[in-house]
């Protein structure tokens, strides 16, 4: 059995004296592990870092075996990502989210969103907006997608500013006003189709977005598995909070 595919390194662990087991999120083969001979060597260390993109060739005698990888770098992001605290936390959190997906189950949209997010970590606000969208995409892939297209009460597609914490559906301003204290806020960048790039956010939008996705991830995905939010998620949000508090450069 063998295949070749694009992949992003999620994690690496040493195996024996010189090998490493590498976990990738691939475009067409999902989250997939394989052994890299010599992967524990100093020569391989710069390549085998979370966030780097590779061309992976996998080979095994049987499909269910761990198999062996040969990896070729296509984009080396790790050195840049290690230069900022929000990126370090963000990459770790993204990997923890990807691990919620079944192993070897293709999720091409998740792969594409991961690439988009990793490539925009130089701007902390844009990266945060992408990460919130990534969490929404994980919810959808696992069967718990939110319906943010129209008001659950009226069917209106305008002034959608709330989300029901029970149904995960959008609620318009007029329909939600009497229960505003019980509803979650829907950030502007999640209700504006033109904001897919991640631009157009405010600090409050980001906090509202993490509150929104965090509520549904915890209730629908993590708690049923006996898990909680990753420490890296909290670290990322704290790093974003500090960045927002810094004085703007003149």
Curated annotation (Swiss-Prot):
InterPro entries named in the record: ARFGAP/RecO, DNA_rep/recomb_RecO_N, NA-bd_OB-fold, RecO, RecO_C
Keywords associated with the record: DNA damage, DNA recombination, DNA repair
Gene Ontology CC: one annotated term: bacterial nucleoid
Pfam families xrefs: RecO_C, RecO_N
GO biological process, one term: double-strand break repair
Known function: Involved in DNA repair and RecF pathway recombination.
NCBIfam families reported for this sequence: reco
Assigned protein family: Belongs to the RecO family.
Identification of the protein by name: DNA repair protein RecO
């Amino acid at each position: 059995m063998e295949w070749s595919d694009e992949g992003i390194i999620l994690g690496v662990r040493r195996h024996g004296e010189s090998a490493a087991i590498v976990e990738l999120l691939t475009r067409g083969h999902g989250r997939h592990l394989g052994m890299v001979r010599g992967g524990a060597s100093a020569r391989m260390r710069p390549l085998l870092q979370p966030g780097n993109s590779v061309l992976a060739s996998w080979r095994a005698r049987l499909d269910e075996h761990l198999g062996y990888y040969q990896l070729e770098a296509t984009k080396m992001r790790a050195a840049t990502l290690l230069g900022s605290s929000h990126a370090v936390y963000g990459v770790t959190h993204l990997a923890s989210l990807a691990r919620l997906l079944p192993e070897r189950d293709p999720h091409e949209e998740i792969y594409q969103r991961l690439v988009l997010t990793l490539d925009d970590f130089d701007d902390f606000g844009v990266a945060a907006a992408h990460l919130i969208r990534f969490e929404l995409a994980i919810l959808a892939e696992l069967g718990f997608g939110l319906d943010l297209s129209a008001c659950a009460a009226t069917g209106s597609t305008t002034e959608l500013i709330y989300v029901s914490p029970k149904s995960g559906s959008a609620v318009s301003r007029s329909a939600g006003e009497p229960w505003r204290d019980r509803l979650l806020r829907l950030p502007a960048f999640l209700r504006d189709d033109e904001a897919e790039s991640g631009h157009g956010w405010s600090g409050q939008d980001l906090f509202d977005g993490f509150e929104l996705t965090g509520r549904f991830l915890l209730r629908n995905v993590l708690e049923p598995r006996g898990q909680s939010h990753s420490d890296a998620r909290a670290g990322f949000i704290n790093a974003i909070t500090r960045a927002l508090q810094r004085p703007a450069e003149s």
